[in-house]
């Protein structure tokens, strides 16, 4: 990789991480009883008083400040592991929530009832952005056993390039490339639909 390209990629990743640290919260504010896996974490701020710009990520319940490359690197650098929180790390890698929302809105007539128990588009987009397992999705979206089976079959179909499970649920032919792409992305970026 050439040096300018490496710098561009590094800058892009740093910008995404800083945006996450500065402006986004993990959790479901505005909803009354989120499941334990989605309990809202305190908003992390860029360069809190006791952190400097070189180490802007403040660990929860600790005076420790981390460099951005230490966040979501597979090792607990914060005492309680807040730098490796599943929802934080999943959300950093996944497509933007607004992109998931736009996708869902375009497919809402067949995808929401068949895969997500007719849940609200905003809620489904947020859950897909942060969920780590099928258990997370099931508990927050109140999925039925049939929804879970449909999600698993649809994801399996997307992974192997077989649209038939989705077409059986009412997916229009023209939607296949977009549906396949998103389901594969979510799966490849950590949404384990086979884990409870």
UniProtKB/Swiss-Prot annotation:
Bridged cysteine pairs (disulfide): 51-65, 59-78, 72-89
Tissue: Expressed by the venom duct.
All copies of domain LDL-receptor class A, residue ranges: 50-90
Keyword Ubl conjugation: no
Compartmental location: Secreted
InterPro entries in alphabetical order: LDL_receptor-like_sf, LDLR_class-A_CS, LDrepeatLR_classA_rpt
Keyword RNA-binding applies: no
Signal peptide coordinates: 1-25
UniProt keyword annotations, A-Z: Disulfide bond, Secreted, Signal
GO cellular component: extracellular region
Name of the featured protein: Neuropeptide prohormone-4
Organism: Conus victoriae
